[in-house]
From Swiss-Prot:
This is tRNA (cytidine(34)-2'-O)-methyltransferase. The keyword Transferase applies. It catalyses: cytidine(34) in tRNA + S-adenosyl-L-methionine = 2'-O-methylcytidine(34) in tRNA + S-adenosyl-L-homocysteine + H(+); 5-carboxymethylaminomethyluridine(34) in tRNA(Leu) + S-adenosyl-L-methionine = 5-carboxymethylaminomethyl-2'-O-methyluridine(34) in tRNA(Leu) + S-adenosyl-L-homocysteine + H(+). Methylates the ribose at the nucleotide 34 wobble position in the two leucyl isoacceptors tRNA(Leu)(CmAA) and tRNA(Leu)(cmnm5UmAA). Catalyzes the methyl transfer from S-adenosyl-L-methionine to the 2'-OH of the wobble nucleotide. Its EC number is 2.1.1.207. Keywords: Cytoplasm, Methyltransferase, S-adenosyl-L-methionine, Transferase, tRNA processing. HAMAP family: tRNA_methyltr_TrmL (MF_01885).
Amino acid sequence: MFNVVLVEPEIPPNTGNVIRLCANTGARLHLIEPLGFPLDDAKMRRAGLDYHEYAQMRVHRDWDAFVAAEAPDPARMFAFTTRGSGRFHDRAFEPGDWFVFGAETRGLAPALVDRFAPEQRVRLPMRPGNRSLNLSNTVAVVVFEAWRQAGFEGGA
């Protein structure tokens, strides 16, 4: 299935929503520290309801530890950023792909975005003049589009 990577998430309910999304779609969740909250935060647990036990989640101390532990294929990693030049719906996603998202208030650090090839820097369309979409909403749109492309494999 797909991999969701949240780099330094800050808002507990967003991460809770993503946990629930991953449990319901079979996506694996990777959290890159530092986190803006403790993992037992009540707001995060409430947003994720009782789905925590069904989600596959790993926590990594930083980006380099994540890359060392998971060894993702750079060609199958996609950085979702408002500074991306490619549109997500023009991509052909494959099971096993890695979808990387930044912190709610600042997105992905420019130095991290620079590690991705330009064609791997992707954005969702928005109306002009808006800054960004909510993190958990963006993750849901991306995961469901990728899962749709995979024929909703494993879904009921």
